[in-house]
Amino acid sequence: MIPRWIQLVGCLLLALMLPPSAAKKDKPGISFHKLHEKPYSMFYFEKSDTVLLNLEDGEVLRSFDAGENWEVIEDNGMKHGVTSIHQHPFDEDKAYALGDDGKHWITTDKAKTWKSFKVPDQAYFKSPQTGPLTFHGRDSSKVIFETRPCPSCAPRSYYTTDDFDTIEVLTESAVGCYWAVGNPQFAAGPNMPKGMEERTVCVVPGLKASSRFAFRLVYSDDYFRSQGIETKLQDGRPVSGVTSIAQVKSFIVAAVESQGTTERALYVTTDIEKWHRAEFGDHRLEQDAYTVLESSDYSLQVDVLTNPFSGMGVLFTSNSDGTYFTRNIEHTNRGPRGYVDFEKLAAIQGIVLVNTVRNPDDVEAGASKEVVSQISFDDGRTFQPLKSTDGQRIHLHSVNSDTNLGRVFSSPAPGLVMGVGNTGDYLGKRSDGHLYVSDDAGLTWRLALKGPHKYEFGDQGAVLVAISEAPKVKKIEYSLDHGKEWKSVDLPHEVDGETSTLTTTPDSTSLKFILLGHSKGEPSVYAIDFEDLHERKCEDEDFDNHWPARLDEHGEPDCLMGQKQFFRRRKANADCFVAEAFNSSMSKFEPCKCTVEDFECQSTRTEDGKDCVPPKSFTPPDGDCINPDDTTMIPSGWRLIPGDVCVRDDGVNLDKDVEIPCKDVNNRPKSKEITSTMKMFSSGLSAYRYLERQVSNLGEDETVLMLSRNQELFVSHDHGQTWQQELKGASIMKIVPHPYNSDTAYILTDSEEVFYTINRGATFGSFRAKTLPDYENGPILRFHPLKRDWLLWVGTECDSGSCHSNAYFSDDRGDSWKTILRHAKKCEFEYKENRPDSLYLVFCEQYENEDDKKRLQLMSTTDERFSDWETVEENLVEYATRAEYIILASHTDKDNALKARVSVDGTTFADLKFPPNVVPAQNLYTLVDASEHAIFLNGTTYVLSLDAVNQNDWGYVDFERMQALEGVIIANIVSNVDELSDGAPKRLRTMITHNDGGEWTLLAPPTKDANGKKFPCSVVEGKGTEDCALHLHGYTERADPRDTFSSGSAIGLMMGLGNVGDRLTSKDEADTFLTMDGGITWKSVKKGRYMWEYGDSGSVIVIVSEQKSTKVLHYSTDEGATWQDYYFSDEEIEVIDISTVPSDTSKKFILWGKKSDELVTVNVDFSGLYDRDCEFDDKGGDVSDDYQLWTPKHPFQEENSDYECDYNYERQNDGTCKLVPGLKPHDPVGYCKAHPDAIEYFEPTGYRRIPQTTCQGGYNLDHQTAKPCPGKQQEYDKKHGISGIGLFFAIVAPIAVAGAVGYYIYTKWDGKFGQIRLGETSTGTQGILSRDSLLVTVPIAIIAGIVAVAKALPLLVTSLWRSASGYMRVGNRSYPRPYASRASFAARRGDYSSVVEDEDELLGVVDFDGDEEEDS
């Protein structure tokens, strides 16, 4: 027997001989590292233990051992210089550290080394995840870096193709730029378009408008070195209003919004070139009301908000090309930021966890949500409740209440899922929840730990780690058997579980974890290591090598996309670790026979959702359908989902052709006939309003609301073919369309009840206003340009005994109201997109001291509660808004005359000062028009544009801006103003301008009338004269102000009623005229008076007799070259109006007429006139066979067509601008006072740029002589002068070069001084420095010429000045701020094309220095 002490000694010796790593530990190791600053962000590098940690003080720490040891990165100035860190999503070795001063860093070796790079502008963060960086999906060295040079500047995109060794400007954009291959799966097939790897996609501003509704989507294959190609989003045509794009696996999604609607459109592509609009059935995509979710390789999943106030949505899944979406589940739970409680399980295909609201009706009525959890095992086709092992229903907190990093429920550990929730009827508070775990991919769940916990997965699911979310936690808990049993280990310090973060490697294969938390208020990091917890590594018998990822209702492995998925997974009770760090469990697949689930619809499903709609148009093969009773084979409408690998043998084949009768084949061509539909009504017409679809609206409706004189409302969704009476029993008084949303209209009644529609008359809702509407004191309802449901209501209140009007505000479409101002007369929202801090800006007219007998004041507020009001004007007459301007008129205290002021920002107002020789007294203003950066106010603005504009008794004037073409305006003037005081009738003439009022001319008359007869007068060179011109009846004579000369879509076309002669005659003598070139030339198209409308963007023009019974209309499809007749009725009716949609893009029209006292509507449909739509292709030399590239021609070609006369200057007969006698130019130094940062100002020249001009370069008539602003001499010299070293080289360098060249020539030239050679002649064999060499003779000649010119130039300048000063008035410039005159360029020569004859025009503007010297 061996003594016991010998056994003990032997055991000790054996223990000492064994390596330390072989010793088994009973708990994981924990190391602690204290941080000196709060952590800002952290991430692991894929497939490594390397971690980056960014602190709030700008330091970046790195750890190469999963958090046990940390060091501060100081490479290339990184210490304290990093504001954010970002991981490359597709390259596991790369990361980026961004600074705030344009200096940034990149690592390409998992943080071992860092390289700095510079980007000129400030970084612009497009998203919190990637910051300013946009990555290429297949080439990690290609990155786009977004910047914004200044807070108000447009984003500027830079790019690199070599990991920022070099960086170049890509382009300036409106939203940002992206790589087309933004995901490795995008365009990865063999038929990838050429240039795809270099292709970039950008959302850029509109060509003219800066509004977001004009944003365009363009792409380039050469980094925009050449002009980009605009994407054809809709039916092969570009679409404006692209606000964002998203890259989701093999899809790119573009979001489009249109002005006038809150409905949005999504366009989807899989190759950038072919786009399709995503269709969601009868669901509308509203603003901020859809979320593109994590999607599969073969479909998109989108959640659509159903009600902006309910926080619920509908989950849709698309087909394989992202075009048609099928509803999966309704009432999904959405958070306030649009996040959806939705997650796909990692690693396993087709399993989706989603939270829904079980009481949607109660929620919409104001109740709290009752959220329940559901799971799908077939990629969202069907859902079922989450069940515990004992059959109880479980509900889990999801995305909207997650408190940890990464995924909410799952990890790459196959089949392991955890979540915090509760059993019962619906989800409770997170603080009352418990931790649940499932090891069968969510099929069954069991309670893991009491109370809410943060959790993580490690070692492919062999280790589960959790920490309580209690405020004070001293331990972590872990499980080694899929959550059945749990153990705990103490932390070195107590941490705050609520704010802690638990994480591990992204692939969940590591045995190491990191806990970020706060200990005693100080940030700290804990590294938790399970590597030494077990002695052995798992062997083959410890694994289930055929674990099924999904089970069907019978518990058998389920198929998805034609295959079953299996994993090799460690058994739950195995006493071992997988210990294969960074080697994820690989799945295996087995094929399945094809079933219905393997097929999708090529287009849309049938109404019952059980079948697919066959193709709408199909041409039978030759030989089929000879007889009507024959049958033919057509596609079924089904197709196998691309990427599905099911076995067709003995399986379902839904995509095989089906047999149908030939009579059902829908391939009949259009009838090429015009159709008409007449409807009769028992009373007359009171009003009609269109609610027009915008680009982003779905549907084919053309909706019209019509109010009869019997106060009945009728609605037509097919442009008057059929009508339905709505709101029966209500006494309708007025239709008020929402001016900023064409889907919305309000229907006012004779009571407090107001009806409304937000879907173009499909449905109607109602509310009760605070007061009865007051129809006598101006507008009742006012609308917010941005917030569709914000309303202002001004109504009369009589509760206190005396009636007065109050202003009320509603932010929920009339459901609730708040009184914002009493004794108010009119209120307006004054929000503008480019007006800072104007979301809550409201202007109201209010009687002083709330006394209706006192004077009117203008009040304003920017307070979101509309309670803090300021007085803008104390003696108001009226105010109005146009474009970016707010104009107000008030009485002066001195003589009670009118004065006007203008504001752009709604806060600061400036007086309008009119030229005193033009407007001696101000009695009435009419704000007739405003374009970008300019206003026309009763024919006058800051400069005189046109004098003696015709005005009626109501203050309206004959003034109309041509739509679509910039700068074209038609106005009527009174040519005999001096005779009016004697009682003479007005003699009107029509004037036109093509440069926004800078110059006006008479309309050029046609030579012949519509019957081919010559007019009584004629002109030469196609220019109107005072004796012979075309004159048109204008705005003041229209029964309906919507009947304009032009159309926004019929480019260049205008029509009007008028006559040829020396003045405008009676309307009874008028004929109908048309122009195709923006008013330069006109032709007579019909004798007599006709009403007109443009259709299909001017492709169809329809005219009908005015104030005369008829049964025929006339139409033209060639812009008025020829006309055809169409008889719309067997009996004559009196047509009182003709209309179409406001955009003039429809092929349908309505004739509004009457027979006796009854209303008649006639829908005239030109849709069948052609059997195809026009095709547009701008890639070729010409646009296409269906389109021509038409460029508007300006009637003037002179340099100063981009300029107008400056304040107190007026146009002369020769076209030049001269100072008005007795007036002074403005003080140019005032510019420096208004712009404190300005360095210089320019002396007045008499000219200033027209606000609308976009010309660049050329001759600047308004900027000639620059002078330094007061106190800015040094900055001015620096800008225009030359530095000391520059001056040194400018003097010394030429002398040195000349000396060197002279010395060389002296030593080499055969004709140098002192050499006299007789009898020698030059030959071709002489050297290059011979006296006859060109290198010698030419420079000598040039030098001699320069010397001669230098001597003669002063004499020439002196001579020219003496000549010019003999006839030019020269004004002193040191006077107060001027107010210019925009005189008639028409007084010049009538055509810009004539040669400038004035010397001052040829040589430039007048130099005023001479006068300054004389005055001094």
UniProtKB/Swiss-Prot annotation:
Record topological domains on the Lumenal side: 24-1284, 1355-1416
Superkingdom classification of source: Eukaryota
Keyword line: Glycoprotein, Golgi apparatus, Membrane, Protein transport, Receptor, Repeat, Signal, Transmembrane, Transmembrane helix, Transport
Cytoplasmic side: 1306-1333
Membrane-protein topology: Multi-pass membrane protein
Repeat positions for BNR: 62-71, 374-384, 436-446, 478-487, 714-724, 808-818, 1077-1083, 1115-1124
Residue intervals passing through the bilayer: 1285-1305, 1334-1354
Signal peptide, first to last residue: 1-23
GO BP term, pick one: Golgi to endosome transport
Entry keyword Ion transport: no
Matches recorded under SMART domains: VPS10
Cellular component aspect of the GO annotation: cytosol; Golgi apparatus; membrane
Family to which the UniProt record says this protein belongs: Belongs to the VPS10-related sortilin family.
Function of the molecule: Functions as a sorting receptor in the Golgi compartment required for the intracellular sorting and delivery of soluble vacuolar proteins, like carboxypeptidase Y (CPY) and proteinase A. Executes multiple rounds of sorting by cycling between the late Golgi and a prevacuolar endosome-like compartment.
Protein name from the UniProt record: Vacuolar protein sorting/targeting protein 10
Gene name of the record: vps10
